[in-house]
Amino acid sequence: MTINDRTAVMTLIASLALLSGCATSVAPNPNATHSYHDELGEFRELPRARLGALPFKGPFTLYTAADASDLGTHTYKAGPLEIDNERERGIVYTRRGGFLDIAHVRNSADMTAYIHARALLAIERGWEVFEFKGHEPSTYRVELCYPDDWEQLDIETRHRYTNELALRLAQRVAFDVMTWHEIITWHGYKSTIVIPENNSAFTYDDIPSHALGVQLAADALRTGRNFDLEMSRLLDEALSDLGVVESDELELAMGEVEGAWWDRLRGPERRLLDIGTDDGSIDPWVVDGHADEPRAYSLARMDDIEGRDFSGFYRVQIDPNVLEGFAIRSVIGEDREYIDPETDFPVLIKDIADSLKVDRVQDLQEQAARR
């Protein structure tokens, strides 16, 4: 096949893809994004991976409290000669936002920035597909479906849409990445290979931490200033706004729910399984007697960008590439290559809830009645 023949075939495939809606072929090959390192800037490499902690004490919980007044400077990825004073991990408690894992907040924020760089590049170049990997072996394929009038939009309007679409897509996909980690962990995946981690899946600090992290990242990226410095400032402000408490009240709040939410030997007694499927928001679990008005964490929406609905702009597919993928496909009931977060995550969450014999979203009053 000559170069001209190959070009003609690719053009025909691309045309058919456009006629059918979202892309059904890879044009250009998403692996090409790896040759655009200069354009991906400071986010061309995967961010550092931080070790989370369970929000209670016990064997293998890796529990440690974080000092919200001394979190250091957020660092996406420290170079060999750079000073790194980030306090990367630890649990805090907030009176409006519940328990939070600082490592998970930071990890989800950095994943948002990592995806945003790729989404922005893809949309600016008019690509229909881009792929990336996180810290696990799974591969994420993101298909982009541009509106029919995309090329007819004036440059300024398309530029505004591009920037906002990349930000919101990055938030939502990063949240999916973090949720996927919880799902495969529940099914037995071990990032440390040896230590069992299913006890850490969907603990009541995880989902709120992810939701907060992706929002802070978007806010930091919107400023156009240094990401690490903005993340440091925004994280401090967010924790203060959520009513972060001192270590002694953290201990009291943790003790109040011992036996109801967690057990020192058995681990978590309750799992927070609300991933915002129904209404796009996550209600934190706050401890009675240690709470002000709880504040829901809102996920980015695609249905109103300058008054325009972009709900169908993207689609995510996950190729598990982990042994736990077989069990996950069994739950879904279909032996297919990709997992679709939009349709499959609710099924997988329901399966977890059924195995725990709980409703998908636990109500605090019901929990209190079980104490």
Task: Give residue ranges: language-model regions.
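Intrinsic disorder/low-complexity signature
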Residues: 1-2, 98
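Bacterial N-terminal signal peptides that target proteins for export
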Residues: 2-11
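Bacterial N-terminal signal peptides
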Residues: 11-20
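Bulky hydrophobic segments
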Residues: 22-199, 218-371
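A structural signal for well-ordered alpha-helical segments within the folded catalytic domains
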Residues: 174, 210-214
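Divalent metal-coordination and catalytic microenvironments
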Residues: 182, 206, 212
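Hydrophobic/aromatic-rich structural module bridging two neighboring secondary-structure elements via a short loop
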Residues: 202-203
